[in-house]
């Protein structure tokens, strides 16, 4: 039974040593035992934060075991793909080997990186010059992506003369229209608020132009990782014996997915370091290099661990949902197990994914704590300052998605054009795919960096609002007014236990 620990005067911000179940809005609707457990975790996390000042001069290596696991997996899989015995050549393998030649893959990847970099710079400049226009564009990025996929399916059906892709395209188009209607009804109020916080990051970018070099580093890392994995994948397709091809191709694809998350989160940490140094007023002559050094050395293990953990938890949640649906169809006993055990497991996975995400990496960049310590510290800061009400009204994921779409289209088009010029239609298809993958990572380094800046400013403001009061007092007042409005409208706070 859930007991709503309610209070009529839940404060906007709770001091570190005054935390209680009744004055933290995040704990109001939780059961008593769980609320007390979370309260103890919040207090322990605050004690850890008080022991470690922001941006210490010396940092210990964190989560080394996961860094070693990522290094061993990368070296093992890539070396295996290079050293596996080749299969005997056949008549059909000549055409595939021509398309997947290393020089051709490197050429299209380089072209895709150039196109993605140009698009990333354009997105960043637009966010700096016209933040409200970018926020409106981000609002409609999801319906636009769905509609774009619908056109791809319809075009494929028309070119191949098959009905199934056309039906899928029509269904996707209908889903895109539904997304557009829901977006217009429920999320338009978030545009001006997101644009307001984007203006803060724009001011930071003006005084810290090293942000653009961080974007370039992200695009370069995306190009490097994609090229390495595609070369290994090409050899597995063309030269490796059929017996080991399936295992090796699957391993390379999984490694590419994990590594792409690592590159994306590494760029996120670099941006968090840049904005965190600005917020705390730390003078650093080489801001970007300092943030990159932290993200690529002492905190790289936390980046690898966080990327793997989020991916694993989301995968478990998907599997649990599938098992739950099967259980409801099979028998009453399985349906009972599905609705109780698996239902709670899915809720736990959703809560864990909310904690173990990009927000946790902010404390890794600021304080150099481990990933689990950072996740707990971030949750405690957000709970004590009621930042969860601000997070609900932001379009952070839409900003990253918008830049991902733009950079993917630009990178895919340039890479496909290069492939067409070098090797015809087949090379254009391969080049377009590689360009899209590089563009997705580049998008995370562009407007994804703006999202990282907003997240860092919010977490730092939750811990200490004074720097934001001095630099942007109007933004501080708007943040507090939004939290106050949500607290007054929260039903759990209007009841007595």
Task: Enumerate the predicted regions with their spans.
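Eukaryotic membrane transport/trafficking proteins
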Residues: 3-497
């Amino acid at each position: 039974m859930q007991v709503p620990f309610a209070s009529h005067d839940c404060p906007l911000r709770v001091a570190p040593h005054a935390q209680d179940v009744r004055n933290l809005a995040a704990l109001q609707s939780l059961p008593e035992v769980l609320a007390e457990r979370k309260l103890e975790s919040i207090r322990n996390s605050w004690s850890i934060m008080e022991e470690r000042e922001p941006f210490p001069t010396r940092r210990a290596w964190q989560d080394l075991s996961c860094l070693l696991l990522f290094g061993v997996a990368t070296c093992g899989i890539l070396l295996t793909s290079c050293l596996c015995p080749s299969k005997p050549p056949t008549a059909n393998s000549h055409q595939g080997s021509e398309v997947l030649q290393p020089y051709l893959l490197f050429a299209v990847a380089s072209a895709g990186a150039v196109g993605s970099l140009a698009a990333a710079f354009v997105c960043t400049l637009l966010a700096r010059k016209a933040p409200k226009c970018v926020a409106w564009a981000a609002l409609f990025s999801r319906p636009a992506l769905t509609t774009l996929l619908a056109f791809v399916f319809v075009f494929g059906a028309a070119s191949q003369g098959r009905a199934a892709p056309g039906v899928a395209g029509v269904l996707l188009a209908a889903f895109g229209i539904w997304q557009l209607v829901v977006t217009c009804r429920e999320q338009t109020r978030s545009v001006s608020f997101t644009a307001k916080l984007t203006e803060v990051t724009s001011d930071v970018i003006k005084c810290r132009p090293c942000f653009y070099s961080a974007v370039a580093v992200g695009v370069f890392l995306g190009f490097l990782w994609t090229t390495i994995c595609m070369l290994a994948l090409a050899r597995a397709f063309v030269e490796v014996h059929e017996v080991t091809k399936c295992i090796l191709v699957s391993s390379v694809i999984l490694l590419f997915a994990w590594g792409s998350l690592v590159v994306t989160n590494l760029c996120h940490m670099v941006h968090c370091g840049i904005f965190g140094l600005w917020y705390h007023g730390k003078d650093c002559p080489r801001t970007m290099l300092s943030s990159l050094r932290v993200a690529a050395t002492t905190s790289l293990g936390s980046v690898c661990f966080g990327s793997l953990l989020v991916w694993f938890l989301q995968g478990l949640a998907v599997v649990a949902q599938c098992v739950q649906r099967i259980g409801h169809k099979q028998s009453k006993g399985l349906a009972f197990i599905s609705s109780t055990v698996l239902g709670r497991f899915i809720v736990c996975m959703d809560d864990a994914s909310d904690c173990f995400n990009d927000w946790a990496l902010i404390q890794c960049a600021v304080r150099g704590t481990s990933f689990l310590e950072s996740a707990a510290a971030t949750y405690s800061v957000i709970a004590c300052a009621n930042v969860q009400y601000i997070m609900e009204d932001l379009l952070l994921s839409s900003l990253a998605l918008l830049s991902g779409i733009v950079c993917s289209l630009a990178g895919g088009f340039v890479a496909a054009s290069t492939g067409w010029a070098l090797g015809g239609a087949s090379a254009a298809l391969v080049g377009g795919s590689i360009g899209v993958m590089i563009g997705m990572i580049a998008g995370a380094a562009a407007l994804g960096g703006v999202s990282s800046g907003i997240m860092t400013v919010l977490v730092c403001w939750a811990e200490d609002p004074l720097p934001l009061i001095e630099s942007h007092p109007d933004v501080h007042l708007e943040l507090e007014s939004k939290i106050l409005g949500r607290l007054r409208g929260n039903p759990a706070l209007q009841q007595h236990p």
